[in-house]
Regions:
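C-terminal catalytic/substrate-binding lobe primarily of soluble NAD(P)-dependent oxidoreductases
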Residues: 1-192
Length: 192
């Protein structure tokens, strides 16, 4: 993340806030997690004052996950259990995954981007996507897979003119990208 124009690290699950989406989603908790904006803090160092990425989950998630982390159950350093080395995180995931994974589970993806300029004016975009019942495709598969497919399509069609190694924000024409996702039912809407 960027704070005062400088890359900064903060603890995961910190700076909890509420973000509200239209029904049926409603209020979600937003909190810091790692990796979401990848190299952007270094690319925009000194150019952007503040840049944050927060994960969204249903209310109560942080209250459950903080003690799990504080107890060391997410640590990756092996510990000895009955003479065998065990990675706490691996054990935790193996133990809870079967209880959290439901065959009838239907996911959703909720995303919001808020931008504010030096002049105080801003813009915001929102994406809400749901499990595709007809095709049996999760919202996460739709939003990630279609995004990659659309980017590849735009490259093949010559709509991405930039060559070489670039980040998507540098290379992919935003309006075309949003329109192509919309054709596939993944709608990014500008909020007013």
């Amino acid at each position: 993340m960027l704070r005062d124009g400088r890359p900064t690290r903060v603890d995961a699950l910190s700076e909890l806030e509420q973000v509200t989406f239209p029904p049926p989603v409603g209020a979600l908790e937003a909190f810091h997690t790692g990796g979401g904006i990848s190299i952007l803090p270094w690319a925009y160092e000194g150019k952007v004052r503040t840049m944050e990425y927060k994960t969204l989950r249903y209310p109560g998630h942080v209250a459950v996950m903080r003690p799990i982390r504080e107890l060391g159950l997410l640590d990756v350093t092996p510990v000895k259990v009955k003479g065998k080395e065990v990675v706490p995180r691996d054990l935790f995931i193996a133990a809870v995954s079967p209880k959290l994974t439901k065959p009838e589970g239907r996911d959703l993806v909720a995303l919001r981007v808020d931008v504010r300029g030096h002049n105080g004016q801003g813009a915001a975009w929102q994406l809400l996507d749901y499990y595709d019942e007809a095709r049996g495709i999760s919202a996460m598969m739709r939003t990630t897979g279609y995004s990659l497919a659309v980017t590849g399509l735009m490259q093949v069609e010559g709509r991405i003119a930039v060559q070489g190694v670039r980040t998507p924000d540098e290379a992919v024409p935003f309006a075309d990208y949003v329109a192509e996702l919309g054709k596939r039912g993944v709608e990014i809407r500008e909020l007013t």
